[in-house]
Swiss-Prot record:
Changing residue 16 to R: Markedly decreases channel conductance and confers resistance to inhibition by ruthenium red. It comes from Homo sapiens. Changing residue 116 to W: Decreases channel expression at the plasma membrane. Does not affect channel conductance. The chain crosses the membrane at residues 22-37, 50-72, 100-125, 181-206. A phospholipid-binding pocket is formed between conserved regions of S3 and S4 helices of one subunit and S2 of the adjacent subunit. It may regulate channel assembly and gating. A lipid is attached at residues 101, 208 (S-palmitoyl cysteine). Residues 313-346 are annotated as: Disordered. The gene is CALHM1. This is Calcium homeostasis modulator protein 1. Changing residue 74 to A: Has no effect on glycosylation. Pore-forming subunit of gustatory voltage-gated ion channels required for sensory perception of sweet, bitter and umami tastes. With CALHM3 forms a fast-activating voltage-gated ATP-release channel in type II taste bud cells, ATP acting as a neurotransmitter to activate afferent neural gustatory pathways. Acts both as a voltage-gated and calcium-activated ion channel: mediates neuronal excitability in response to membrane depolarization and low extracellular Ca(2+) concentration. Residues 10-37 are annotated as: Central pore. Oligomerizes to form hexamers and octamers. Does not form gap junctions. Associates with CALHM3 as a pore-forming subunit in a hetero-hexameric channel complex. Changing residue 10 to R: Decreases channel conductance. Decreases the inhibition of channel activity by ruthenium red. Its main location: membrane.
Amino acid sequence: MMDKFRMIFQFLQSNQESFMNGICGIMALASAQMYSAFDFNCPCLPGYNAAYSAGILLAPPLVLFLLGLVMNNNVSMLAEEWKRPLGRRAKDPAVLRYMFCSMAQRALIAPVVWVAVTLLDGKCFLCAFCTAVPVSALGNGSLAPGLPAPELARLLARVPCPEIYDGDWLLAREVAVRYLRCISQALGWSFVLLTTLLAFVVRSVRPCFTQAAFLKSKYWSHYIDIERKLFDETCTEHAKAFAKVCIQQFFEAMNHDLELGHTHGTLATAPASAAAPTTPDGAEEEREKLRGITDQGTMNRLLTSWHKCKPPLRLGQEEPPLMGNGWAGGGPRPPRKEVATYFSKV
């Protein structure tokens, strides 16, 4: 069983786009299930029906949209790219727009499903517009002019509540309910049709007219995603090597002090030969992973430099040395060994 879960997890990791599409589909199904389980209670009061219905129609989609953005890991990447200092790498607004649109398209699926299900069900629309039913056309129009406007609004506001509705002498409740639900379902199917056409235009037609710009934005958004993953992986590898070498030096220095009978305070004066690891090949490999960054201050300057002044997107050319918060290691940079395969989830 664990092997199956491991295989599924590895598949999802290697297919980030399919994984995000699956998450969006699950959220869409969850939004429909949430609406079916939701207990809709119209207040049946003239001043509150519209506000209650608007809250039911708009608030849950907003929450679902924000949840869709939160569950997308690219939100932090987009914010980081948007707010980073310019440095030696220009920021392309087209790439930022592409990244945001890619996330927004997936995050909008669940809100669209909620709005469509709400309109097709008709309860929310019935509660919101029950006071706008044309009594003269659907009910006893001869009695309507004799009623004061507040009294007429009070009677019509109770149409969604069959247990308290007392205006059958003016307008049959079933007639008003069927009339409003018919309009609501027509709006619901129109909304589904419009969103489907809009999605078709965005996904299929737009790249045909702006193919070059679309390909550029897509490529560089994927590059930003992969660059961030590689940097995080390199930092993780460096942190592991740094911790391993630091712990080895501590244990070997402690062993040296115990052999000499020194106290705890002499750890800092242990000879450098005592800190040499017992396995030279393994130690050399760990030293190579450190890439010349062997102290906390240098690492902090490197991270600050990466944030403030990312390297230009120019390969095969000699880069000018970074000043201040740049490369602090002596001599040339050690060779890098980076062999990895990533699938972008943008």
